[in-house]
UniProtKB/Swiss-Prot annotation:
PTM annotation, UniProt: Cycloviolacin-O8 is a cyclic peptide.
Name of the protein: Cycloviolacin-O8
Species whose genome carries this gene: Viola odorata
UniProt gene name: Voc1
Residue location of crosslink Cyclopeptide (Gly-Asn): 85-115
Tissues of expression: Expressed in leaves, petals, petioles and roots but not in runners (at protein level).
Amino acid sequence: MEMKNMVVGLFLIAAFALPALATNFEKDFITHETVQAILKKVGPSSNGMLDEQTISALTGKTIISNPVLEEALLTHSNSINALGGTLPCGESCVWIPCISSVVGCSCKSKVCYKNSLA
């Protein structure tokens, strides 16, 4: 009986802890430089006001500035993108689409890449 209680307890812990843990690992991010590029591109045409959808998307992403994380993403993008492999937009698109589409980026393999034709 004691073993059964331990197994049930383990399943209860897993049921509540694992979904919260998974959401921390798959959060979208955006770099400070990308936010600045978006604001520079959008700002003058709209008198400094962003639309509600853009504000919601920006607040849903985690701003990063860690050079180690950026270097890891650059290394990872080299293996995915055989045509260039640079860190083009500094943004992920796991859950939220590329906000940097304003500056010519699109989503590929959960990372926003710059369209070379734009």
